Amino acid sequence: MTQQITLIKDKILSDNYFTLHNITYDLTRKDGEVIRHKREVYDRGNGATILLYNAKKKTVVLIRQFRVATWVNGNESGQLIETCAGLLDNDEPEVCIRKEAIEETGYEVGEVRKLFELYMSPGGVTELIHFFIAEYSDSQRANAGGGVEDEDIEVLELPFSQALEMIKTGEIRDGKTVLLLNYLQTSHLMD
């Protein structure tokens, strides 16, 4: 038996940059008992992320940028090393990630491979992230990257082994990045 969910109330608490909802709903459990819940849900739209790798050079391209939420949560500099990513903004995931790759890393990638879609924080955030990988070469470098407008992004081309070590040392603490680096390692694409 599937659980039945009845929306009681959806109150918007904030609609500034993204939308924060206060949701009241009844959940009918498998045993038939109905339980009322109130939760705040943050709707930031869906996104996509990509790990660029070069199997010949044994390198990956990551970015470093300021992330205010990490700063609020104790990351003193607020800087985070991560894979290129962005919100879909009504684009298809592959279209989005190609745009983000060129804006943030400067690489105009060829074939991209979609791996999976994951919720990263389903207890309170609606975002579904589409995960991609793509090989890159030096000849695909179209510009310096660094993002657009108010973004201040540093492009990092790192040895793959160093990126894996940076997970162990805590220098890489972004979930999507750890997932993609571990995928690349277990897929043996860099062997």
From Swiss-Prot:
| Binding, Mg(2+) 2 | 100, 104, 151
Q: Name one GO cellular component term.
A: cytosol
Q: What is its EC number?
A: 3.6.1.-
Cofactor section = Mg(2+)
Residues annotated to bind GDP-alpha-D-mannose: 17, 38-40, 67, 85-87, 104, 127, 150-151, 176
Which residues does Mg(2+) 1 bind? 85, 104
InterPro entries, per this entry?
NDP_pyrophosphatase (IPR004385), NUDIX_hydrolase-like_dom_sf (IPR015797), NUDIX_hydrolase_dom (IPR000086)
Q: What is the protein name given in its UniProt record?
A: GDP-mannose pyrophosphatase
Q: What species is this protein from?
A: Escherichia coli (strain SMS-3-5 / SECEC)
Q: What is the lineage of its organism?
A: Bacteria, Pseudomonadati, Pseudomonadota, Gammaproteobacteria, Enterobacterales
What would be the name of the gene that encodes this protein?
A: nudK
